[in-house]
Every structure is written in C-alpha cells, then in structure tokens.
Amino acid sequence: MSKDDLIQFTGTVLELLPNATFRVKLENDHVIIAHTSGRMRKNRIRILLGDKVTVEMTPYDLTKGRVIHRH
C-alpha cells in the first residue's frame, strides 16, 4: 500500500490509553483507537486530553489509526 492510499481526518482526543494509544473522536463523529506515530515518539511530542490531532487511517480498517500531527 502506498502513502497515497491513506485517509487523513482531524479529531479530538477523548481518552488516554496505555502504550501511547488514544481514543479519538473524528470530525465526522466516529470514535476510533489511534496510536502515536514513530516520529512523534522519537521527538517525545506529548498528546494530552482534548488536543486536536490529525489521524491517518487505512481504508481497510476504519476503526484504527495513527496520530501524525498535533495542532
């Protein structure tokens, strides 16, 4: 799968879960589970409750995603 196949959404962090995982409510009112991308872990970017984030998702599983940017 190429990078062009990924879908990006904006959402808000609802809940902090273990292992850098978050429950995120997307702008279309879907709630998904998202984990932090490797670059964000490497640079130690903290994500807190209520933060606006950009989530990247694959079209094959629309219940999971990856947080790629914090606004």
Swiss-Prot record:
The keyword Heme does not apply. Keywords: Cytoplasm, Initiation factor, Protein biosynthesis, RNA-binding, rRNA-binding. It comes from the Bacteria. GO terms for cellular component: cytosol. Residues 1-71 form the S1-like domain. GO terms for molecular function: ribosome binding; rRNA binding; translation initiation factor activity. It is found in: Cytoplasm. One of the essential components for the initiation of protein synthesis. Stabilizes the binding of IF-2 and IF-3 on the 30S subunit to which N-formylmethionyl-tRNA(fMet) subsequently binds. Helps modulate mRNA selection, yielding the 30S pre-initiation complex (PIC). Upon addition of the 50S ribosomal subunit IF-1, IF-2 and IF-3 are released leaving the mature 70S translation initiation complex. NCBIfam families: infA. PANTHER family: TRANSLATION INITIATION FACTOR IF-1, CHLOROPLASTIC. Belongs to the IF-1 family. Component of the 30S ribosomal translation pre-initiation complex which assembles on the 30S ribosome in the order IF-2 and IF-3, IF-1 and N-formylmethionyl-tRNA(fMet); mRNA recruitment can occur at any time during PIC assembly. This is Translation initiation factor IF-1. It comes from Rickettsia typhi (strain ATCC VR-144 / Wilmington). The gene is infA.
